[in-house]
Amino acid sequence: MDPETCPCPTGGSCTCAGSCKCEGCKCTSCKKSCCSCCPAECEKCAKDCVCKGGEGAEAEEEKCSCCQ
């Protein structure tokens, strides 16, 4: 079982199995990545990532890992 916890402070669910909708999700086995920024033009990002805040210049510095 995943050792990291996922309190889901912003709602959603994270079973550390296949869902990740928590801002503070640290589940290493979560199939979806928690990205700070998911550009709309990035289909893979929109499909496999859960965006959690960050807009403008701040988001630009934190490129979504799914797009790299």
Curated annotation (Swiss-Prot):
GO CC annotations on file: cytoplasm; inclusion body; nucleus; perinuclear region of cytoplasm; synaptic vesicle
PROSITE patterns: METALLOTHIONEIN_VRT
Record-linked Pfam families: Metallothio (PF00131)
Protein family membership: Belongs to the metallothionein superfamily. Type 1 family.
Annotated binding of a divalent metal cation 3, by residue: 16, 20, 25, 30
Matches recorded under InterPro entries: Metalthion_dom_sf, Metalthion_dom_sf_vert, Metalthion_vert, Metalthion_vert_metal_BS
Originating organism: Sus scrofa
UniProt binding sites for a divalent metal cation 7: 51, 64, 66-67
Residues given in the record as a divalent metal cation 1 binding sites: 6, 8, 22, 25
Function, in words: Binds heavy metals. Contains three zinc and three copper atoms per polypeptide chain and only a negligible amount of cadmium. Inhibits survival and neurite formation of cortical neurons in vitro.
Name used for this protein in its record: Metallothionein-3
Modified residues (Phosphoserine): 33
Any one GO biological process: positive regulation of ERK1 and ERK2 cascade
Tissue specificity as recorded in UniProt: Brain.
Chain intervals for the UniProt region annotation (Alpha): 31-68
